Design a protein with these regions (language model features):
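A compositional/biophysical signature of low hydrophobicity enriched in polar/charged and small residues
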Residues: 1-92
Length: 92
């Protein structure tokens, strides 16, 4: 499973409606509203980079999104994190 974080800038006041739309997109595992440089961040979890790209394209078609920045978590980091989670479960 690959993960990416999509940071969004939205038109003022449209954040709640955009959050509702984003959470309906398959592949979006969570999304929250932020204060600061970005208005919303969504976590996308998919099996491949191509599937992540499809989900990001769907997000970017939502009305009132002004810009987006997508950061894909490195595969090495995800593998290390997954191995650590498994190890923690075994120890417990």
């Amino acid at each position: 499973m690959l993960n990416a974080f999509v940071f969004l800038n939205c038109d003022i006041g449209t954040e709640p409606a955009i959050l509702n739309e984003i959470t309906d997109i398959s592949g979006v595992s969570e999304a929250v509203q932020l204060s600061g440089v970005y208005d919303i961040v969504a976590k996308v979890s998919e099996q491949s980079r191509e599937d992540i790209a499809k989900s990001v394209r769907k997000i970017r078609t939502i009305a009132n999104i002004k810009s987006s920045l997508t950061m894909i978590v490195s595969e090495e980091e995800q593998q290390q994190h997954s191995a650590k989670q498994i190890e923690e479960r075994v120890v417990q």
